[in-house]
Amino acid sequence: MKEKKGHYVPPSYIPLTQSDADTEVETTTPNLEIAVSESTKDDPRQWSSGICACFDDMQSCCVGLFCPCYIFGKNAELLGSGTFAGPCLTHCISWALVNTICCFATNGALLGLPGCFVSCYACGYRKSLRAKYNLQEAPCGDFVTHFFCHLCAICQEYREIREQSSGSYPLDMKMAITNAPLAQTMESAN
């Protein structure tokens, strides 16, 4: 297995009904039967990176911060929406246009309202990503995650898609393959 530098692994989630002491006892007692049964379950898996692990991948962090509609459109395209432009433009319009209207109409009082519109739209893609890769609904529900941490959420989704597709890259995540043209000759008409 190849080790990655800067690869963040989020801590395991502890259910509210379980204490930290119970978790330590379970993790310090290795049992082969438990390991085998856990690997065969269909329990949701953890995300490959945490919601706040944006700085582990500076490229997606910068693009997600300065042009979130691009990352969102790329995520939607890789999840099977069939197009990049539709989700990208919808995200851009729902974020920028509604934000501008709310800001000017209320003198800045409802500046956070557009987050609700974007969250309603984006949480559907997060849900389909979780279903596709059997991921936990963490750190919160899909809507709440996008409502409070939208930029971090789309960067996390982008990192997850890239991590899951490593080794079997989709066509648009690697360099284009160009074949040389066939040799051609010209013949005279005489």
Curated annotation (Swiss-Prot):
Topological type in the membrane: Multi-pass membrane protein
TM stretches of this protein: 78-98, 108-125
Keywords assigned by UniProt, alphabetized: Membrane, Transmembrane, Transmembrane helix
The keyword Repeat is assigned to this record: no
Subcellular location: Membrane
GO annotation, cellular component aspect: membrane
Cited InterPro entries: PLAC_motif_containing
Family, as annotated: Belongs to the cornifelin family.
Function: May be involved in cadmium resistance.
Descriptive protein name: Protein PLANT CADMIUM RESISTANCE 10
Originating organism: Arabidopsis thaliana
